[in-house]
Amino acid sequence: MNVYYEQDADLKHLQGKNIAVLGYGSQGHAHALNLKESGLNVCVGLRTDSSSCAKARQAGLEVNTIADAVKWADIIMILLPDQYQKAIYETEIAPNLETGNTLAFAHGFNIHYKQIVPPETVNVIMIAPKSPGHLVRRTFTEGNGVPCLIAVHQDYTGNAKEQALAWAKGLGGAKAGVIETTIKDETETDLFGEQAVLCGGSAELIKAGFETLVEAGYPEELAYFECLHELKLIVDLYYEGGLSRMNYSVSDTAEYGGMTRGPRLITPAVKAEMKKILEEVQDGRFAKEFIDECNSGYKNLTSLRESNTNHPIEKVGAKLRNMMSWLIKK
């Protein structure tokens, strides 16, 4: 696996180019502002009725409609939600592409699952910061950066990789390290991680732990602190130094209990289910399910959101967080 740093990337591959960032959400604002402050020529493409137009202009960015931004640009970064990209690509992006343009993405979903099939006469690249947009922005303003993944899906001009590296450098990512991968690997590992560990597995583990304590007669407040609130302290240790750092930092009692009881929870049956989840990502079943869900008006997702919001851990959590002055503003 190739890893690149600042000396391996050169902004000259973007200098003199017109760069359009489509979208101004978490990632969009970070990409647009970081590249602009890296000395590049950037505009933001948004719907005319978007509430983000005023925010982008207030930040000193030029704002155009999506279609006009694409017409103007040499390099187009699509940072719109996955489920909207296909329709906007077909109606506002594809008709305005020119030979030699570069299409860029921060996640490979629509390319990998062929929701978007660009013409062969354009570059297709990915630059994926491994961090939420607000951290991409904050670390840049502090003179640092977050690690990025890059991938080249199509190289029409012969310098697509150089453009991707330059973009990562403009974001600040080359200070932390830029890892070269493929659209396929980024998409499949990203989706699996979200579903099995980060957003799915961890949330269900938290709820199950909370429910177990409450059903055994313990106060909801104690269950919340033990199963959700303190998780941040543990995750911070993982983040800073891996599993070993966590084990070193906790008590011997906690370390022994975790090492002997953890495997009783994450059994071979759980790992087998993880493999099934990965297979659904790999063969496109999850992508089809999600696209069908979007087309149905999010009926299942709406119900799941409501159920999650009404879970007792959310009610007691809101009450307890109101006691934590450092969290109120967030």
Curated annotation (Swiss-Prot):
Q: What is the lineage of its organism?
A: Bacteria, Pseudomonadati, Chlorobiota, Chlorobiia, Chlorobiales
Q: Which family is it part of?
A: Belongs to the ketol-acid reductoisomerase family.
Q: Which residues form the KARI C-terminal knotted domain?
A: 182-327
Listed name of the protein: Ketol-acid reductoisomerase (NADP(+))
- EC number(s) stated in the UniProt entry for this protein: 1.1.1.86
Q: Does the keyword Magnesium apply?
A: yes
The top EC class, named as a word, is oxidoreductase
Q: Where does NADP(+) bind?
A: 24-27, 47, 50, 52, 82-85, 133
Q: Keywords of this protein's UniProt record, alphabetized?
A: Amino-acid biosynthesis, Branched-chain amino acid biosynthesis, Magnesium, Metal-binding, NADP, Oxidoreductase
Q: What does this protein do?
A: Involved in the biosynthesis of branched-chain amino acids (BCAA). Catalyzes an alkyl-migration followed by a ketol-acid reduction of (S)-2-acetolactate (S2AL) to yield (R)-2,3-dihydroxy-isovalerate. In the isomerase reaction, S2AL is rearranged via a Mg-dependent methyl migration to produce 3-hydroxy-3-methyl-2-ketobutyrate (HMKB). In the reductase reaction, this 2-ketoacid undergoes a metal-dependent reduction by NADPH to yield (R)-2,3-dihydroxy-isovalerate.
Q: Which residues bind substrate?
A: 251
